Amino acid sequence: MNSESAEILEVPLAGGNMAGAVVKVGDTVRRPVGPQTPTVHRLLAHLRAQGVDWVPRVHGIDSKGREILDYIEGEVAHGEPPYLRKLETLTTIARRLREWHDATATFERKTDDVWWWPGKEPAEVICHVDFAPYNHVYRDGVFVGAIDFDVCYPGPRLWDLAYTAYRYVPLVPHSEDDVPDGPVFDLSVVAERTEYSLPERLARLDTFLAAYAGEDAALLYPASALLGWAVPRLVAMADWSDAQESAAVRDNGRMYRAHSEWIAAGGLGPAQQIDVVDLRV
């Protein structure tokens, strides 16, 4: 095989549940585009200009109409690899999300921007919306990058924080809790239950929130606030799942709804009541 044929060899990659088929070509990734692609590309360029070097560079559109991004070498954290629940991983993820939020706070919003969803009030930052293990790349157990930016949109910091905490703390019932949350469609990417005790989960949540805030006391959110935001965040996931054709995905939606109700009922302690308002277009 010569260098030219090696360069055009397309290697299918796992994932692509939102964007469709994803392939690796050389040291790049090729992905289908959508109406939001130009806005997302502008966002990624802004992030890198702000020093967020763990998001891929954009290299334009190929001859097949697909976007061209850097390929980030490593493994995507599907399932429960040993490093996923380390405290070091938890704090790293919180700090990376803080970097993302701070950088996107200065992103220039334009009237012709297109997002997957108009957004949520208050539109403090551009939320990744799916900042979760299955969209994170690790190398030797260390976070090295994030992928999949198709569903980004403006929103509150806590909208993002709630879902990331749900996945990484995790904010899910104990394996022995009586919560009607099954079955789910893909246990390799859904940590639907945990063996952490309630005190352990709350301690991990406090660690996550402290790492996100750093030295900024104004961003040290109380656990009750994050838990409050987790309720509508999971309801949004459930609503999206309910609208899908796949019965398996709708099963997954039942899990999100059951977990939202469990958190709202105090499964992890007091949760503030949050009324979420969509941005108007």
Predicted feature residues:
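Soluble or luminal CAZymes and related metallo-dependent hydrolases
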Residues: T39, T89-T92, E200-R204, M255
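Active-site activation/catalytic loop segments of kinase-like enzymes and analogous catalytic loops
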Residues: L161-G214, V231-A243
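Catalytic activation segment of kinase domains across protein kinase-like and atypical kinase folds
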Residues: W116, V125, A132-S175
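Actinobacteria-biased recognition of intrinsically disordered, low-complexity terminal regions
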Residues: M1-M18, A265-V281
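ATP/Mg2+ or Mg2+-diphosphate-binding catalytic cores
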Residues: R233-V281
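Eukaryotic Ser/Thr/Pro-rich intrinsically disordered, low-complexity regulatory regions
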Residues: L219-A223
